[in-house]
């Protein structure tokens, strides 16, 4: 049930490095800990911190393609805004993403047709030497509200050092104006996923908008099925290479509102069991089922999937 995606990096026609989606399953468990009153710092490959309706992941999924280190500090939520930061230095594997430290909002899976708004605010800054990295929202969908992605929607609001999105041709397929910004839209594929990437013309270090407008553009203009189910929505940075880098989110928020229909697997069925059976799913981003186990303990494999074992 648990699989590991293998990154495949190609060059853009313009010569920039290309970001690939981080894997949605890994073989090693994640250590998740609730945030205490003080800031919490973690440095393990799959470490994460929960606070105020968000889970922030260190997520060093591509670390073996280079050499370096990364740590994550979560300050917590104040006045409705999450603050966190990551420090990293990576060398080698210049065309490979090393990690995706990111914050994922806790929300049940929902059909795209049922989502009425995804309001978000993100204020951030980046410093470092010879950085190649992006700053991006990352949304995953599939047809059955499970945890195997079929579509990935990225919204890039920052890029450094020639980082570029997955693309079949290296050229944008459209230039939609969304929220007063003209974005370059790229389309590509990775493993079983179709990847859409909206890339801003420059760094937007204080972004405020509604991500549902990107979703609607894809369903209305690019053939993405509105029946797809959004099960994970995060925001973070993908580093390739650089040294002494610090990415700081000084204020972040996201919420997902639905019209009350079209979410999950539909109504009329039995209520989910109070606890999952042995080897059953017991958690993960967007998971709305049982979170305890009738046998064994609930162990996180990654930010999308936890299993009773």
From Swiss-Prot:
GO CC terms: extracellular region
Q: What are the BP-aspect GO terms? A: cellulose catabolic process
Q: GO: which molecular function terms?
A: cellulase activity; cellulose binding
Q: What subcellular compartments does it reside in?
A: Secreted
Indicate which residues are glycosylated according to the record. 206
Entry keywords, A to Z:
Carbohydrate metabolism, Cellulose degradation, Glycoprotein, Glycosidase, Hydrolase, Polysaccharide degradation, Secreted, Signal
Please state every residue range assigned to the domain named CBM1. Answer: 274-309
Q: List the disulfide bonds.
A: none
Enzyme class (EC, first level): hydrolase
Classification via SMART domains:
fCBD
> What EC number(s) does its UniProt record assign?
3.2.1.4
Recorded catalytic activity of this chain's protein: Endohydrolysis of (1->4)-beta-D-glucosidic linkages in cellulose, lichenin and cereal beta-D-glucans
* Signal sequence region: 1-19
- Name the Pfam families on file: CBM_1, Glyco_hydro_12
What is the recorded function of this protein according to its Swiss-Prot or TrEMBL entry?
Answer: Endoglucanase that hydrolyzes 1,3-1,4-beta-glucan.
Family note: Belongs to the glycosyl hydrolase 12 (cellulase H) family.
Q: What other remark does the UniProt record contain for this protein?
A: The biological conversion of cellulose to glucose generally requires three types of hydrolytic enzymes: (1) Endoglucanases which cut internal beta-1,4-glucosidic bonds; (2) Exocellobiohydrolases that cut the disaccharide cellobiose from the non-reducing end of the cellulose polymer chain; (3) Beta-1,4-glucosidases which hydrolyze the cellobiose and other short cello-oligosaccharides to glucose.
Q: What is this protein called?
A: Endoglucanase cel12C
Give the source species: Pyricularia oryzae (strain 70-15 / ATCC MYA-4617 / FGSC 8958) (Rice blast fungus)
* Gene symbol of the encoding locus: cel12C
